[in-house]
Amino acid sequence: MDDSTQAAEAVITTPTGARTVRFETGRLARQAAGAVVAHLGDTMVLSATTVSRSPKEQLDFFPLTVDVEERMYAAGRIPGSFFRREGRPSEDAILTCRLIDRPLRPSFAKGLRNEIQVVATVLALDPDTLYDVVAINAASASTMLAGLPFSGPIGATRVGYVDGDWIAFPTHSELERATFDMVVAGRVLEDGSDVAIMMVEAEATPGTVALVAGGAPAPTEEVVAAGLEAAKPAIRELCRAQSELAAGAAKPQREFPLFIDYHDDVLETLTAAVGEELAAALRIAGKAERETELERVRALAVEKVSGQFEGRDKEISPAYRALTKKLVRSRIVTDGVRIDGRSTTEIRELSAEVDYIPRVHGSALFERGETQILGVTTLAMLRMEQTVDTLNPDRTKRYMHNYNFPPYSTGETGRVGSPKRREIGHGALAERALLPVLPSREEFPYAIRQVSEALSSNGSTSMGSVCASTLSLLNAGVPLKAPVAGIAMGLIREGDAFVTLTDILGAEDAYGDMDFKVAGTQEFVTALQLDTKLDGIPASVLAGALQQARAARLTILEVMAEAIGGPDEMSAHAPRVISVKIPVDKIGEVIGPKGKMINQIQADSGAEITVEDDGTIYIGAADGPAAETARSAINAIANPQMPEVGERYLGTIVKITNFGAFVSLTPGKDGLLHVSKLKQLAGGKRVEKVEDVLSVGQKLQVEITEIDARGKISLAPGAESIDTVSAGS
C-alpha cells in the first residue's frame, strides 16, 4: 500500500457469513476534492467528488450531478457497440445514478449553489456481486472527504429475504433464492440512538411466486418492515467506517456561500397581504379551478408587496411558495383535511377501462382523479427481446417497460424526444412491480413490450402505470399470476408528529416530506420506492405507511377486477407463438445443412422459428394454422412416429438416380421408389430411364412396402398414382 493511502473497513455479519466493505483514499484521483475506492470482495468502485470554485447565483436549485461510469473491462469484456467503446450510460447505470442522488441531495446544506459532481466508476466487478450499493457508499465517502457542507455519512446496503432470513449484501446466487430484494440507505442520528431511513428501492423477485408456493414466507408488509430494521446494523457499520476514514483524511470544511431564497420580512408581508385569500383558494377541490384562483392570488400578491421590496423581487416567488406550503401542511396536520378536501386515507375517484385502442394487442386506460395513464401491450417472438450490453449478468430482457411523460400531461410545453432519467426510473419501477407476476418463458413464449403513456398528471403516474399495465397485459391475454396495483403515499412532519397521506396529489408531493410508492398483489408487496426531503424517517413510521398503503391497494384492485377479471382471448392481430421440445441431438437435423431444413419449413409454413440450446423450439406465426404446420414438420423430423408397412403418403420426388427415385414422405424422412417398380406407371413396360416417367418436384402417391433393419424405406406407387400417370400417358 502507498504511504499516502488511508483505509477503513466495515464488517457486516450475515447468516451466510461476514461481508467486508473496505474504503481507501489517497492513492487514486488525487486532484478531486474527495476520492474513495470502495471494495466488496473483487468488486472495486472509484468515486470522485468535485466542486466548482464559484457558485451559480442565478440558479434557484442545487446543481448536484451524479454520473456512473460502467467500464466493460471491469467484467473482462469488450463493449458490443460498433466502435467497441462505452457510449451513453446504460439503464442500469442511470438507475444507480438515481440511487446515489436521492439520499445525497437532501444531505447538503440548503442554499448551496456551487456545482457539485460525483462520478462513480466501476473498475472491477465480481460477477456474483451487485455494484450499485458499493457505489452509493463510495459516493458518500468521497463526499465526506471533499470539505463540503454535507451532513453525512450515508450508509447503504442491499438486503435479500432468503429462506426466512434477511441477508445483507446478497450475491446474485443468493438472490435467486430470495423472495424480496431491497436497497436501503440511511444515516445515524446525531445522538447515535437510531438509524433514519432516507431511501428505499425494493422489489419482489421473478421467482417469488414459485418460492412462496413452495413454502417460502411471502414478502408481506410486516416482512418488508422487518427488512428495514434488518438493514440498520449494516448501515450503522458502514457509516462508522466512513466516519473513521473522514476523521483522518477529510479536508477542512470550506466556507461556501448559502443563498437564502427569501428573508422573513417578505414572508410576513405576504402573509398579511394575501394569507386569507390564499388559504381560501387552497380549499378549492378541482385542480383547474384551484390553479386559476391561485394564479389570481399570486398576481395580487406581487402587486401588493413588490413596491415594498425594491431590488428584492426575486424573493417574492419563493416566499409565496413557502406560504403556500405552510398553509397546505398546517391544514393537513391541524384539521386532517387536504387540498382537495379528502381525508388523509381517502383515494380519489377511480376508473378502469380495457380494450381502449383498436388493433393493438392489448390496451387499458386507468384514471385516478386527474392522473390518467394509457397502457399498451405488444407481443412478439422471443427473438425480439432486448439485448442488454451492461455489467449485469442478465444479457436479455423479455419484458420491456417504457414510460413516457409528455409535457402536455401537466398542461405545459417542453422537449419531446429521448427519455430523461426520471422517465427511465419510473419505467423501471413499474417493470419491477410486474416482473414477479409475469408467466415464465415456457408458460408464455412471447417477448412483451409494455408502454405507459402519462396523458395527464396530478400525482403518482408511476403507480398509475402499474395499474394500467396490469389491465393492458390481461387484455392482451398474458396469464399474470396475480393482478398488481400501486399507490403513492406522502408524509407531513411537524415537530415530532407524522401524518401519512394516501394517494398524494402533485402539490402534496411538492410540499410534503416523503414520496413513498408501494405496489403489490392482494397477498404481498412486489415493489416499493421511498424518497424523502428529510434527513431520515423512523422505520416505525414507514411500517405504518405500508399498512395504510395496503388498504388503498386492495381498494384499487377491486376496481380493476370489475374492468377485467382475468386474461382475455389474445387479439386476432397478435402473433401466435407455440413451443415444441425436441431431443438436443436432433437440433442439427431440424436446422439442416447450412439451415436448409429450417429455412424450408419457414418458407412452407410462413412461420418464424427460434431454436434454443436446450432443444426448445419457439414457433411464431400470424395465425394458428401456420404455426401448427411448422410444428408438425418439426415433429416429423425430431419426434417422428415410425412409419409402418402399408401406410400411404403423398410424397414429393426430391432426387432421381439411375436405380430409382427418392421420395420425401415427411421432412427428414425419405423412401426409395426403385426403378423396377416404375413399370406400373408405364403401362407394365420396363423403364430404362427414370426421367422418362418421373421428375424432381413431382407429387406422387406412394405406399410403404418394406422397412429394413436399418430403417430404410422401400416404396411402390399407390393406386391413385398409377391411375393418374396412366391417364396422362
Curated annotation (Swiss-Prot):
A Pfam entry, by short name: KH_1
EC supergroup of this enzyme: transferase
Cofactor: Mg(2+)
Recorded GO MF terms: 3'-5'-RNA exonuclease activity; magnesium ion binding; polyribonucleotide nucleotidyltransferase activity; RNA binding
GO cellular component terms, semicolon-separated: cytosol
Binding residues annotated for Mg(2+), in chain numbering: 509, 515
SMART domains: KH, S1
Swiss-Prot/TrEMBL GO biological process terms: mRNA catabolic process; RNA processing
E.C. code: 2.7.7.8
Highest taxon listed in the record's lineage: Bacteria
Protein name per the record: Polyribonucleotide nucleotidyltransferase
Species of provenance: Parafrankia sp. (strain EAN1pec)
Lineage: Bacteria, Bacillati, Actinomycetota, Actinomycetes, Frankiales
This protein's encoding gene: pnp
